[in-house]
């Protein structure tokens, strides 16, 4: 069933109302807006969540040069997600504002909102039929600080609520510090959409600055340096260099051994030729047969005299 079918006919004159504002920030999925009247006429199959954005003008300067402009309160929840103070309201027993104030009393302790603080309603994505309502109230910076102090002493502090945080609305020169880095955190439900929507509708941050902050969070980040992997790669390179040096040294040693063997062979061949020449000379001298016989009679003499000659002849 569509929303309009669920809520029935609008009151007289409602058809001429201007269209509800949308977020219109690239990279952020739009949620369907509803008027408070439409939301209140949704059937019993719908759940209602109500949350509050408390903020105050802040004339402070970060580092003496970056204007803070506004202090906006959000909460770090028990599940590690960021969100606004508030929760689900059972419409069978409570009005939206009474149910919201009941939840705020548990998490903040000293603030009550009225229908005049109502800002917007949106249908949420997902399988559950939930309409999300956002209220916003501007306080003085002193009042906001009092709420921050009171929140520390509330019943839910340290249990469902880990603490209050202020949203940085500026962007530093590196284009990530401030709002972009904050938006890169994880938010519960529609909280991120509601934050951006409220900042735009209340003219707290220009729309183009919101778009730039969202776009900065969607750029691929450089991978972190794995120092262990770098050390392992360096060690592997050193081992590879040592192995190459060893192979070169082994090749050099083999070449030197081959050269030495060739030199010895040449010397042996030369010695064989000299031995052959000596034998031939002795054979030509009268009475030399006895000397030749004596040489052959010595142990290993045949190997010395004959083998080199045979190798030389080959």
Swiss-Prot record:
Interacts (via the cytoplasmic part) with syndecan-4 (SDC4), but not with other syndecan proteins. Myristoylated in vitro; additional evidence is however required to confirm myristoylation in vivo. Coiled coil: none annotated. Ubiquitously expressed. Expressed in embryonic brain, eyes, gizzard, heart, intestine, kidney, liver, tibia and skin. It is found in: Nucleus; Cytoplasm, Cytoskeleton; Cell membrane; Cell junction, Focal adhesion. GO terms for cellular component: cytoplasm; cytoskeleton; focal adhesion; nucleus; plasma membrane. SUPFAM superfamilies: Nudix (SSF55811). GO terms for molecular function: snoRNA binding. GO terms for biological process: negative regulation of double-strand break repair via nonhomologous end joining. A lipid is attached at residue 2 (N-myristoyl glycine). It is a lipid-anchor. It comes from Gallus gallus. This is Tudor-interacting repair regulator protein. It comes from the Eukaryota. Its main location: nucleus. Keywords: Cell junction, Cell membrane, Cytoplasm, Cytoskeleton, Lipoprotein, Membrane, Myristate, Nucleus, RNA-binding. Belongs to the Nudix hydrolase family. TIRR subfamily. The gene is NUDT16L1.
């Amino acid at each position: 069933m569509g929303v309009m079918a669920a809520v029935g006919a609008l009151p007289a004159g409602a058809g001429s109302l201007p269209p509800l504002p949308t977020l219109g920030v690239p990279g952020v999925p739009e949620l369907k807006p509803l008027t408070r009247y439409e939301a209140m006429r949704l059937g019993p199959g719908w759940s209602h969540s109500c949350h509050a954005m408390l903020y105050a003008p802040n004339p402070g300067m970060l580092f003496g040069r970056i204007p803070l402009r506004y202090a906006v309160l959000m909460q770090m929840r028990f599940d590690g997600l960021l969100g606004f103070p508030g929760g689900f309201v059972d419409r069978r027993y409570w009005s939206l504002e009474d149910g919201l104030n009941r939840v705020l009393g548990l998490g903040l302790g000293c603030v009550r909102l009225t229908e005049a603080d109502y800002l917007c309603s949106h249908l949420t994505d997902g399988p559950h039929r939930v309409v999300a309502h956002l209220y916003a109230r501007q306080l003085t910076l002193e009042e906001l600080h009092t709420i921050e102090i009171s929140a520390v002493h509330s019943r839910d502090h340290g249990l469902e609520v880990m603490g209050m945080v202020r949203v940085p609305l500026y962007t530093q020169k590196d284009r990530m510090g401030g709002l972009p880095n904050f938006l890169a955190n994880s938010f519960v439900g529609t909280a991120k959409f509601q934050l951006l929507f409220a900042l735009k509708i209340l003219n707290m941050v220009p729309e183009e600055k919101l778009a730039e902050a969202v776009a900065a969070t969607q750029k691929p980040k450089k991978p972190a340096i794995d120092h262990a992997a770098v050390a392992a790669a360096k060690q592997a390179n050193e081992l590879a260099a040592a192995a190459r040096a060893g192979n070169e040294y082994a090749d050099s040693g083999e070449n030197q051994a081959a050269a030495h063997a060739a030199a010895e062979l040449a010397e042996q061949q030369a010695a064989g030729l000299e031995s052959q020449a000596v034998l031939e000379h002795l054979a030509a001298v009268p009475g030399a047969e006895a000397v030749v016989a004596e040489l052959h009679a010595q142990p290993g003499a045949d190997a010395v005299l004959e083998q080199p000659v045979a190798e030389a002849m080959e």
